[in-house]
């Protein structure tokens, strides 16, 4: 059993985790000579590649000098806390990857804390030392201090450090002397990370993730905790709620390279996939047929944000998407629940076409919406709401730890913006010409903060936040102050009309786009909502005029991403999401009806 190492990779967004794993796979000869390696094997869905973040964890294994190294990729974002904990449960050690210039970031801290609590042995990799003005020694100190803050044990604090550049494909003991391969790192992994303990006895396997194949159905993935699993043996599945079910393993697979390989038995400590089980959830245990002993299930963080999902009932319903009915959306949400641990879905007040979907944050939910949109779904979502809790009779709300890194001249603006949203500044560090400011801020305050922070700092700010705890309610927070400009009629928007209305605010539509009554087409300069007619064309006469017409000079529209739309809308607005467009609209489309309901 000395020949297996299970290792989780922990890193902040864009510190080069996926690149490093690609290089490790090259070293382990996973690609044939001359095979095209386009990179980013792990971030395999389009969304992950576009945003440069890892959402779903994946398993890869490589062979190095006779030792099998299972590499588990973890999502770096605290919004995907559910994913992180499952992965760490399968590892014996972790690879902490930090940027030689930026140092450890708040997001990394979240995952690292979980890893240290589980007692994993860390190896620190200081990456990107080829960048100009990097500071590897300081970063090493920062990592050490961070580990101390997180109450690491003495054994954990005695961690080896490897310097290198994943992009250029080298790792070494000293950052001043580059080598030409990453062997040093792989040797360190085999040397430092403990081999999994061999536990004799009845078999136990905690299901920590799901795979799905259209041929065999759902596949359970997990690490054999104790004993040996054999192909075709009879087993018991112990569910989280205490019920048990007798069944049989059809096939066992281990991970080889990027694929599966069929095997007849798996010893304790290795990670495998079990085919042929029917009803199981993540957190269930596969145990002995005769006397089952379940393992404790995975504790997953509670959701902190919720959103209303509903079917698309706008005038453009069904024009762009393939799946629009409530049954389609319901099935899709149920499918998502199977593998997305931190998600909750409940029907909204006895309706069949509205759901309250709760998750770990705006990012967690918007990734789900974006994925559905690409699969061809049409739906509408309401404004993100924070989930309140009652603790000892006091109304409490989630509070997050927020870090903003900006050039010095913008620091006062940032502090002003965050304190207005009931944030408290906890520390401020000067790093050269930039400042690192830390706050505690209610989750409500973070909704819509990113856009404002980027505008105020001319796009220079780096912002990261993670859930901290529930604290007593902090009072009202003022939302966006500008009203919306709303289309009066359905039709095509004309440049002539938009041109005449430019001084009223900024537009979210271009001339020639189709709009419908009640759609939010722009942001008003004042606080009240303004209903405008953008579908009005110029009246032409047959009298020849002496002067020439003024040409309509229309300022290009403001383009908003899904997160920005979600953060922008008010309580009485929805975001309509279709595979081709995202539109903002009022819940009540008809102008007169909306007026009446406002009076009530």
Residues covered by each model-derived region:
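P-loop NTPase switch module centered on the Walker A-proximal segment
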Residues: 1-104, 142, 210-213
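Conserved nucleotide-binding/hydrolysis micro-motifs of P-loop NTPases
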Residues: 15, 27, 31, 77-78, ...
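Interdomain boundary/hinge elements
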Residues: 36-42, 150-162, 196-206, 242-255, ...
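Canonical P-loop GTPase G-domain recognition
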Residues: 121, 131-191
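Charge-rich, low-aromatic oligomerization/scaffolding segments with amphipathic character
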Residues: 140, 284-287, 356, 362-378, ...
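Conserved nucleotide-binding/hydrolysis modules and their immediate coupling elements
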Residues: 204-307, 317-319, 482, 491-541, ...
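Long insertion/accessory domains within large nucleic-acid-processing enzymes
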Residues: 255, 260-263, 441, 452-456, ...
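A short, contiguous, amphipathic alpha-helix enriched in charged residues
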Residues: 314-337, 551, 555
């Amino acid at each position: 059993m000395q020949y297996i190492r299970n290792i989780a990779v922990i890193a902040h967004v864009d510190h080069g985790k996926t690149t490093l794993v690609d290089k490790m796979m090259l070293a382990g000869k996973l690609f044939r000579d001359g095979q095209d390696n386009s990179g980013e094997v792990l971030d395999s869905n389009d969304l992950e590649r576009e945003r440069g973040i890892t959402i779903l964890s994946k398993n890869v294994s490589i062979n190095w000098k006779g030792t099998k190294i299972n590499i588990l990729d973890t999502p770096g974002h605290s919004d995907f806390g559910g994913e992180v904990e499952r992965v760490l449960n399968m590892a014996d050690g972790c690879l902490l990857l930090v940027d030689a210039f930026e140092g450890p970031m708040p997001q990394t801290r979240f995952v690292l804390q979980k890893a240290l609590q589980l007692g994993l042995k860390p190896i620190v990799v200081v990456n990107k030392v080829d960048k100009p003005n990097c500071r590897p020694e300081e970063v090493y100190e920062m990592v050490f201090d961070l580990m101390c803050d997180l109450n690491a044990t003495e054994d954990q604090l005695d961690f080896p450090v490897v310097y290198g550049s994943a992009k250029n494909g080298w790792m070494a003991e000293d950052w001043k002397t580059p080598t030409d391969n990453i062997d040093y790192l792989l040797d360190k992994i085999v040397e430092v990370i403990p081999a999994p303990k061999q536990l004799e006895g009845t078999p136990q396997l905690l299901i920590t993730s799901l795979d799905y194949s259209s041929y065999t159905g759902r596949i359970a993935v997990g690490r054999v905790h104790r004993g040996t699993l054999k192909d075709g043996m009879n087993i018991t599945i112990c569910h989280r709620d205490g019920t048990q079910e007798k069944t049989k393993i059809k096939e066992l697979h281990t991970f080889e390279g990027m694929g599966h390989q069929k095997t007849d038995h798996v010893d304790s400590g290795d990670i495998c996939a079990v085919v042929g089980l029917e009803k199981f959830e993540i957190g269930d245990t596969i145990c002995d047929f005769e006397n089952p002993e379940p393992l404790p299930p995975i504790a997953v963080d509670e959701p902190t944000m919720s959103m209303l999902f509903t079917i698309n009932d706008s005038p453009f319903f069904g024009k762009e998407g393939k799946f629009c009915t409530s049954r389609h959306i319901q099935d899709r949400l149920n499918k998502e629940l199977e593998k997305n641990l931190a998600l909750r879905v409940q029907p909204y007040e006895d309706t069949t076409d509205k759901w309250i979907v709760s998750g770990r944050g705006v990012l967690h939910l918007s990734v789900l919406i974006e994925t559905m949109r690409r699969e061809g779904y049409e739906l509408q979502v309401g404004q993100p709401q924070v989930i309140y809790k009652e603790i000892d009779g006091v109304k409490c709300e989630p509070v997050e730890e927020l870090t903003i890194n900006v050039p010095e001249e913008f620091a006062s603006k940032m502090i002003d913006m965050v304190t207005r949203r009931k944030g408290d500044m906890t520390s401020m560090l000067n790093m050269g010409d930039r400042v690192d400011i830390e706050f505690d801020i209610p989750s409500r305050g973070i909704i819509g903060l990113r856009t404002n922070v980027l505008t105020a700092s001319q796009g220079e700010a780096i912002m990261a936040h993670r859930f901290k705890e529930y604290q007593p309610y902090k009072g009202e927070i003022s939302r966006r102050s500008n009203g919306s400009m709303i289309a009066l009629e359905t039709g095509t928007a004309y440049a002539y009309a938009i041109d005449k209305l430019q001084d009223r605010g900024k537009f979210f539509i271009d001339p020639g786009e189709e709009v419908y009554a009640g759609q939010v087409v722009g942001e008003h300069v004042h606080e009240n909502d303004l209903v405008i007619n953008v579908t009005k064309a110029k009246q032409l006469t047959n009298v020849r005029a002496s002067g020439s017409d003024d040409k309509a000079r229309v300022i290009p529209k403001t383009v908003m991403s899904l997160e920005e739309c979600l953060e922008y809308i008010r309580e009485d607005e929805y975001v309509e999401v279709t595979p081709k467009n995202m539109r903002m609209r009022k819940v009540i489309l008809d102008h007169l009806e909306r007026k009446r309901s406002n009076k009530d």
